[in-house]
Curated annotation (Swiss-Prot):
Catalytic activity: phosphoenolpyruvate + UDP-N-acetyl-alpha-D-glucosamine = UDP-N-acetyl-3-O-(1-carboxyvinyl)-alpha-D-glucosamine + phosphate
The EC number(s) this enzyme carries: 2.5.1.7
Source organism per UniProt: Wolinella succinogenes (strain ATCC 29543 / DSM 1740 / CCUG 13145 / JCM 31913 / LMG 7466 / NCTC 11488 / FDC 602W) (Vibrio succinogenes)
Name of the protein in its database record: UDP-N-acetylglucosamine 1-carboxyvinyltransferase
Keywords for this protein: Cell cycle, Cell division, Cell shape, Cell wall biogenesis/degradation, Cytoplasm, Peptidoglycan synthesis, Pyruvate, Transferase
GO annotation, cellular component aspect: cytoplasm
Binding, UDP-N-acetyl-alpha-D-glucosamine: 93, 122-126, 308, 330
Length: 421
């Protein structure tokens, strides 16, 4: 099993190119199950989760041609199976995204209950209720979601009790081939959802309200789609993580290949802390702060502050003057990085879903263990500012979502090596 060894205290400088967004690529790969032609996806991040989902599609019978590490062609015209088995799905919760397209196109599917990051309950009930509303018969049998719609799915009004990104994406894909009009109320507005809608729209599906919390999809009545070539949007969470790396070490770094408006919640918070930000059309530059001030964060749905940046900003809070308050409203059990940050010397007090971080802390090296994808990135950030050499274990979590992390950080001047234990 690999680990990262990081010697802290080095200033960072230079530029880093942001990879394609994993959370945009996963629904787009799933959506190729709706295509009658060969679909070409570009700017895919070269990370484990993408490889896992492509392997799942191959298991279903899709032909996957890997042109290069960031480009694939997927042909789903001859799917042999509609069963997504446990041995693949257990590795990644996002595998649930094949539910909507399989059910919509083939009228049946079996999807193992998903795995992935252990960060609390993310019930798939919202997905299942939506499919039932669209006419599917859904049961849980032997750890599998078994769904059947022998007469096809029909349009319906889906009002989500709470905003769900993957739930919105699943319903959008299911609605694409359904009969009639589907309305989604309280829809997620994330850029990744927007890109999925735009790709389906380019493939011939009429969708109104893209980017809003109310979507209207006119189904194609079972007619498979003609996909155009797709370039995956840049990863706003990876971009935010590198901005935090610069902020942790109070350095100046430049990000290439970003969409600045996708990062507004993050960049506004960094400016509030005291950093300067120079904005370009598709690039950003972080400028050092004369003083790093404490801050408050409440995680919420886009366009609010993203839960996927909560752990990174908790690491940053250790280097700010005063007490920062971080409230996690989206997921339970998403403070598993706290105990590991405390091993490095962070002063963090937890009460329910709120963490108080006493800043100005001198972090000292230690052996720490990654518990999930974003928590592991917080440990990397903390190690960049810690005195001495920190070893981060179980970094397979990082490899699920960050492409060539150590190479990119090393290019910025970080002292970081990957080892095997």
């Amino acid at each position: 099993m690999d680990f990262l060894s990081i010697t802290g205290g080095e200033k960072l400088q230079g530029s880093v190119s942001v990879s394609g967004a994993k959370n945009a690529a996963l629904p787009l790969i799933s959506a190729t199950l709706l295509a009658k032609n060969e679909a070409c996806l570009k700017n895919l991040p070269d990370v484990v989760d993408i490889k896992t989902l492509l392997s799942l599609l191959e298991m279903l019978g899709a032909k996957v041609q890997r042109i290069d590490p960031h480009t694939v062609k997927v042909n789903s015209s001859e799917i042999l199976s509609t069963k997504a088995t446990y041995d693949i799905v257990r590795k990644m919760r996002a595998s649930i995204l094949v539910l909507g397209p399989l059910l919509s196109r083939f009228g049946k599917c079996e999807v193992s209950l998903p795995g992935g990051c252990a960060i609390g309950a993310r019930p798939v009930d919202l997905h299942l209720k939506a499919m039932e509303k669209m006419g599917a018969i859904v049961e849980i049998k032997g750890g599998y979601i078994v769904a059947n719609a022998p007469k096809g799915l029909k349009g319906a009004t889906i009002a989500f009790d709470k905003i769900t990104v993957t739930g919105t994406e699943n319903v959008v894909m299911a609605a694409a081939l359904a009969k009639g009009v589907t309305k989604i109320l309280n829809a997620a507005q994330e850029p990744e959802v927007v890109q999925l809608c735009e790709v389906l729209q380019a493939a011939g599906v009429e969708i109104k309200g893209i980017g809003s919390n109310e979507l209207e999809i006119v189904g194609q009545e079972g007619e498979a789609l003609e996909f155009k070539e797709v370039e995956v949007i840049p990863d706003r969470i990876e971009a935010g993580t590198y901005l935090c790396a610069g902020a942790m070490t109070n350095s100046s770094i430049r990000l290439e290949r970003v969409v600045p408006e996708h990062l507004s919640a993050v960049t506004q918070k960094l400016e509030e802390i005291g950093f300067g930000i120079e904005y370009g059309e598709n690039h950003l530059t972080l400028l050092p702060a004369s003083k790093r001030r404490a801050f408050e964060i409440i995680t919420t749905e886009y366009p609010g502050f993203p839960t996927d940046m909560q752990a990174q900003f908790m690491a940053l809070a250790t280097q700010c003057e005063g007490a920062s308050i971080i409230e996690e409203r989206l997921f339970e059990n998403r403070f598993m990085h706290v105990s590991e940050l405390q091993r490095l010397g962070a002063g963090i007090h937890l009460r329910g879903n709120t963490a108080t971080v006493n800043g100005g802390t001198k972090l000292l090296c230690a052996d720490v263990m990654a518990t999930d994808l974003r928590a592991s990135s917080a440990l990397v950030l903390a190690a960049l500012a810690a005195e001495g050499t920190t070893n981060i274990h179980r970094i397979y979590h990082l490899d699920r979502g960050y492409e060539r992390l150590e190479e990119k950080l090393r290019a910025l001047g970080a002292v970081i090596e990957r080892g095997r234990e």
